Amino acid sequence: KFLLSILYFLLSIILVLALWFCFSALDKKKSIAMIPQNFHALVHTDSLYDAVNPLLDLQAADIFLSSENMSDFRGIFINLRSENIRNNKLIKVALQRKIDAALYTDSQNNASYIVCADFGFLSAITRLSRFIIPILKINGISMINENGLNYFVFNSNGNKFYFKNVKNLVILSNDFEKFKIALKADNDLTYNKEQLEILNKKTTNPIKIVINGKQVIQSFIQDNKILSLTNSIFDDSSLSIVSFGITDQKITLDFDVPV
């Protein structure tokens, strides 16, 4: 009876874990709901591993990292290039995450960003972050709870990074105001039908960049009265796609520009 009780207990734990992982895989929020309007560029990949892995073999990367000011990153790059890491099944699964990263600039050309990572079924772990991270007591990370909003802040050399899990997603930003807008989780409602079609469009290349043409042009011509006249060519809501893949043998580029 004792052994049978242990067996039932273990089966119960396995069942609870299975249900929790299934729930985490099904209870989803789309990344675009966390991306505020008016970005300069939005970088998307369906798999971080598939996007980054080919870049590790580029000969150009060796030349770039051979410079003295990149010496701090050379060791990290060599370790990442190691087959033991790249072919590790657990690492592959962990890095096969959808990533969206949106870049913004204000009127003073200060840059900010929102990064949204879709952990899928692995969000069974990230959903517990508010309980796990305080226990780990990681240096520089503090949990904030104010006005009903709880999130984490990572302080590094005077810079603050804000992050929080939302269902299957983890949101990261260096700008608190943008971070709060992202956490409303309804930003997808602010895009029109044409924009959503562009944002959700699949590409054959591993990396897709969605550009707000007017926002980018404005950042370059805002002080030039003559060039600013060309700004009217671009619709306020028009988005364009640049997707690409890079190997030593070839660079693949695709453009999708509305006219």
Predicted regions and their residues:
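Short solvent-exposed loop/turn micro-motifs enriched in small/polar/acidic residues
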Residues: N145, V153-N157, S237
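Structural boundary/hinge residues at secondary-structure and domain interfaces
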Residues: L4-Y8, I13-G140, I144-Y151, E197-I233, ...
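Extended, charge-rich low-complexity interaction segments
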Residues: N174-K184, L227-T247
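A conserved glycine-rich beta-strand in the N-terminal activation segment of trypsin-fold
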Residues: F152-N224
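Generic beta-strand structural signal
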Residues: T105, M143-E146, F163-V166, S173, ...
